[in-house]
């Protein structure tokens, strides 16, 4: 579980969100990130703990409060929003990848979509070695990215005085990311042998890594004067390393969205197989990312 949630935390979306906090300055921005993640991760923990103790997926736990019909409504809505998340994440990842190697965003949509399908086909329980290698690579590459931002960036930084961001809004943005995993986390804690420890490990790992991503984004905007991570990495000459960060961070995060859409579909129609639906969701998300412009909703 820890590796899965490490992958969820390493995300281009979280880095981009971190850039919005730059007008607060590093110290106040970091305080907002920490407070927001403590609030969000507490709620994330209890949501995951319910599923872990009951041995039920996220949408099955909803039925405990809203009944069978109410649970069906939430399951349908959850599938729809996870399809949307899958499309948006693929779109963002493809744009970032195309900013490094200009081969066309649609090419990267297909590459990212294919890798997500591979992740789902292998299955959560069989991802051990693949995840270990992918997470180790991402860990090393993100440290390299930190060095570029915090040690090779401009000492003058960017003029962000014209941008408005209240402390409360920054806390809200920091709460948003862990909160977004509430309809998903139980899908990955339901089979835990030690519910409290497994859920705590998942949430702590995610919370720490998510804070790290926010800080990378915020630091990028403050110290380099640039909010586009792809441009920062390209200027630093990271090349293939930059591409690997973008692609694998997108895959390891979006995989959870697509797979959980499949798990939620099982709450609607018991005969459906979650991994099969997850693959279909990935295909739909990939096609949507290629066809529809999503700049205004990312």
Positions of the model-derived regions?
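Juxtamembrane helix-boundary/capping and inter-helix hinge elements in multi-pass membrane proteins
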Residues: 22-27, 52-56, 63-71, 190-198, ...
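Transmembrane alpha-helical segments of multi-pass small-molecule transport proteins
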Residues: 4-5, 72-79, 100-122, 136-146, ...
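Hydrophobic transmembrane alpha-helices that form the core helical bundles
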Residues: 70-102, 250-267
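Membrane-water interface regions at transmembrane-helix termini and the short interhelical loops
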Residues: 19-23, 49, 88, 92-100, ...
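Membrane-interface helix termini and inter-helical loops of multi-pass transporters
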Residues: 94-99, 152-162, 223-233, 294-297
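N-terminal hydrophobic signal/anchor transmembrane helix of membrane proteins
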Residues: 1-28, 117-126, 131, 219-223
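Extracellular loop-to-transmembrane helix junctions
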Residues: 18-49, 70, 206
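Hydrophobic, membrane-embedded alpha-helices of multi-pass small-molecule transporters
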Residues: 1-14, 146-152, 159-222, 234-256
